[in-house]
Regions:
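C-terminal transmembrane-helix exit sites in multi-pass transporters
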Residues: 34, 88-113, 225, 239-260
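Juxtamembrane helix-entry segments on the extracytoplasmic side of multipass membrane proteins
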Residues: 12-20, 46-51, 124-148, 187-205, ...
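Glycine-/small-residue-enriched transmembrane alpha-helix faces in small-molecule transporters
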Residues: 1-24, 59, 117, 128-158, ...
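Hydrophobic/aromatic residues within transmembrane alpha-helices
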Residues: 9, 18, 22, 72, ...
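Helix-helix packing/entry segments at the starts of transmembrane helices
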Residues: 18-21, 80-87, 156-177, 211-248
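Specific transmembrane alpha-helical segments of multi-pass solute transporters/efflux pumps
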Residues: 1-3, 38-85, 121, 207-225
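Transmembrane alpha-helices of multi-pass small-molecule transport proteins
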Residues: 11-64, 89-95, 147-155, 170-189, ...
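Hydrophobic transmembrane alpha-helices of multi-pass small-molecule transport proteins
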Residues: 30, 104-126, 241, 257-276
Length: 279
């Protein structure tokens, strides 16, 4: 659903305009929730360094992350961006291992390389011998977005756990820092959201569901698990539905190289899950 929503919404707005519109909706969503819950008052009890950390992290995610992600979706077919985006299930535990100072095993490294082989299949349209990349900028941005997303969520979770902060308050601070910057850049770049129903609906849906409710559920899941790989197992549920929506709603013809690449990526992720359960 996410890939279809992103690509459809980008028909009405530039990536910068879309993230600004969606982030405004998300900021309002989190603002209402922290006010109703009464957690906004606790900002005065937080250390200034912690508040500053939450604000600065907002420049990374949502501001920079979603601009990178939406630009990747703007440059790539939705099916390719969606498939590459699934490697967050691999990137997240790798980034987490850096913070926990544990090196991945040779098996984990091999499975990671297998997943990235799938990306190579997608990026070259299956022409691995020639290594001629189709839309290399979009592929690079899609990959970069998984690193930025994983990095921001691991750091955010550590800040929340170390300081016993309400996760939704932390997210509200993230968006509070990102929003002024996004609007300034949007205005200066002359990329204001378009005045259309599609623009409004796309911004509201992405801001409320993909960046609002989804953020709340994901943050709670991150706090309740001691192993991010367990959460990333949910990644296997979405690809068939995503491809169906992309084909029917966006009328994209699903390429054979996309299917093959996605299967290889999911094989690597499945291997990671098997290793986790075998420990």
């Amino acid at each position: 659903m996410m890939a279809t929503a992103f690509k459809w919404a980008l028909e009405f707005n530039t990536p910068m305009a879309l993230i600004t519109l969606a982030a405004t909706v998300s900021w309002g969503f989190f603002g209402v929730r922290v006010v109703v819950a009464g957690s906004l008052k606790s900002v005065h009890e937080m250390k200034s360094g912690v508040v500053l950390s939450c604000l600065l992290l907002g420049l990374l995610n949502p501001a920079f992350f979603y601009w990178i992600l939406f630009t990747a979706y703007d440059l790539l077919p939705a099916q390719d961006a969606m498939a590459i985006n699934y490697t967050w299930g691999l990137t997240l535990p790798l980034v987490a291992s850096v913070f926990s100072r544990t090196l991945p095993t040779k098996y984990e490294t091999g499975l990671a390389l297998l997943s990235y082989l799938g990306i190579l299949v997608i990026a070259t349209n299956g022409n691995l011998g020639a290594l001629e990349f189709d839309r290399p900028a979009g592929v690079a941005l899609a990959l970069l977005s998984t690193v930025i997303w994983s990095l921001s969520w691991v750091i955010n979770s550590r800040i929340i756990d170390a300081n016993n902060i309400d996760p939704e308050l932390a997210l509200f601070l993230n968006f509070s820092a990102a929003l002024p910057l996004l609007w300034i850049v949007t205005v200066l770049a002359g990329q204001m959201p378009t005045n259309s129903m599609g623009s409004l609906l796309g911004g509201i849906y992405i801001g409320l569901f993909e960046m609002g409710i989804a953020f709340v559920l994901w943050m709670r899941a991150m706090r309740l698990t001691d192993n991010p790989l367990r959460i990333s197992s949910l990644i296997f549920l979405a690809p068939p539905l995503s491809l169906l929506l992309i084909g029917t709603v966006l009328n994209e013809t699903i390429a054979g190289s996309t299917l093959v690449g996605l299967v290889i990526i999911l094989m690597g992720l499945a291997g990671q899950q098997w290793l986790d359960r075998a420990r």
